[in-house]
Regions:
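Non-catalytic all-alpha helical scaffold/repeat segments
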Residues: 1-202
Length: 202
């Protein structure tokens, strides 16, 4: 079973952007996060788990009773945004050619500004130029489903604005296959074809 005080769980609490349970301020968290991801491959998963909407709960670390400890600093909205941005930048930088890592980042991208989304997708497009068609299809299909879902439920509170969705759609067009057959394989997905312009749900 999963241990609540495992090293991974402890690191997730320490690097949680919106809950400060240690004496590190936001800038120090970012600095330590960079050092961690440079040294350990598994650190990527720790930081990715702290991206917006991916971590719903956090608990404080136990503090020693035999000595005085530094008090944790209050987190401002500016601090929170800065940490989220730097975590995304670090995870993007170290995503490499791993399609599953890129997929994870795509799933959390809607919480970021348009400019950050554009920057992210430009990096993704450049990275896919060295990917095989199967990996490109994997990522393009994921993006397609996001566009489909938000346009199908466009009246929902959580639906993305059309200007953001256009960034996703343009990314799909910009990722090209070596074999043109891959451009049409999404049409044969069973049960739920991810059309870019579905008839909205009413």
């Amino acid at each position: 079973y999963k241990m609540g005080n495992s090293p991974k769980n402890t690191l997730e609490v320490i690097f949680c952007p919106w809950f400060n349970s240690c004496s590190l301020n936001s800038n120090e968290k970012i600095k330590q996060a960079q050092s961690l991801i440079e040294k350990y491959k598994t650190a990527w998963n720790v930081l990715a788990s702290q991206l917006p909407e991916s971590h719903a709960m956090a608990s404080s670390l136990l503090q020693p009773k035999y000595r005085i400890v530094d008090e944790s600093e209050e987190i401002t909205y500016g601090d929170l945004d800065n940490v989220y941005i730097e975590y995304l930048n670090l995870c993007t930088q170290y995503a490499g050619m791993d399609k599953k890592r890129w997929k994870t980042l795509i799933e959390h991208l809607d919480r970021y500004s348009i400019d950050l989304q554009k920057d992210f997708f430009n990096k993704l497009i450049k990275k896919t130029q060295s990917m095989c068609d199967n990996d490109k299809e994997y990522l393009k299909t994921k993006i397609r489903y996001i566009v489909y879902r938000h346009r199908f439920y466009n009246q929902s509170d959580w639906a993305m604005e059309e200007d953001k969705l256009m960034i996703y759609e343009n990314t799909i067009s910009a990722i090209s296959f070596n074999n043109p057959i891959f451009d049409y394989r999404y049409l044969f997905i069973k049960h739920n074809m991810p059309l870019l312009h579905p008839i909205p749900y009413k």
